[in-house]
């Protein structure tokens, strides 16, 4: 019996793409910062001249899937991370955006076999979002760690 697990120390040669929603950028910029910190601490070159990392900004979380899909299909990335923050308002818009973003990101991973980390905060208030993006903890760091684990795991699995 084989057992497969991703490792966090296997970042050499890993190409990472990050798609960040600009809407609620007070939150998403902090998520990106935490994510980059994690990747850097685990050996990914996050410099402006990096050949290991690309970051794409989109208007909002609804647009995350289409850009993630394009990045996955181009064959240059072993793992993708989507970052966004959708905060509940007084209309059903929240439910529509969250449902479509989550389904879309999941479909990209299924259709392309490229792991796509769903790093979209879904909160009731801005305060809750800020707490998850740096005041109490930074989930961006966790999303970076998940990407490292999944990138490593996918490299370890037998290919079709």
UniProtKB/Swiss-Prot annotation:
Pathway: Cofactor biosynthesis; riboflavin biosynthesis; riboflavin from 2-hydroxy-3-oxobutyl phosphate and 5-amino-6-(D-ribitylamino)uracil: step 1/2. The active site is at 93 (proton donor). GO terms for molecular function: 6,7-dimethyl-8-ribityllumazine synthase activity. It comes from the Bacteria. Its EC number is 2.5.1.78. CDD domains: Lumazine_synthase-I. It catalyses: (2S)-2-hydroxy-3-oxobutyl phosphate + 5-amino-6-(D-ribitylamino)uracil = 6,7-dimethyl-8-(1-D-ribityl)lumazine + phosphate + 2 H2O + H(+). The keyword Disulfide bond does not apply. (2S)-2-hydroxy-3-oxobutyl phosphate binds at residues 90-91, 132. It holds the Pfam family DMRL_synthase. 5-amino-6-(D-ribitylamino)uracil binds at residues 23, 61-63, 85-87, 118. GO terms for cellular component: cytosol; riboflavin synthase complex. Catalyzes the formation of 6,7-dimethyl-8-ribityllumazine by condensation of 5-amino-6-(D-ribitylamino)uracil with 3,4-dihydroxy-2-butanone 4-phosphate. This is the penultimate step in the biosynthesis of riboflavin. Belongs to the DMRL synthase family. This is 6,7-dimethyl-8-ribityllumazine synthase. The gene is ribH.
């Amino acid at each position: 019996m084989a057992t497969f697990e991703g490792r966090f120390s296997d970042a050499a040669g890993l190409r990472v793409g990050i798609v960040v929603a600009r809407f609620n950028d007070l939150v998403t910029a902090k998520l990106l910062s935490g994510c980059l910190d994690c990747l850097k601490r685990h050996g990914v070159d996050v410099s402006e001249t990096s050949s290991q990392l690309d970051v794409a900004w989109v208007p909002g979380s609804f647009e995350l899937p289409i850009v993630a899909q394009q990045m996955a299909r181009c064959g240059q990335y072993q793992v993708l991370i989507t970052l966004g923050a959708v905060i509940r308002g007084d209309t059903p818009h929240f439910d529509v955006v969250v449902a479509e973003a989550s389904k879309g990101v999941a479909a990209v991973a299924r259709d392309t076999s490229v792991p796509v980390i769903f790093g979209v905060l879904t909160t009731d208030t801005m305060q809750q979002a800020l707490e998850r993006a740096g005041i109490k903890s930074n989930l961006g760091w966790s999303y970076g760690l998940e990407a490292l684990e999944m990138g490593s795991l996918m490299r370890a699995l037998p290919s079709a």
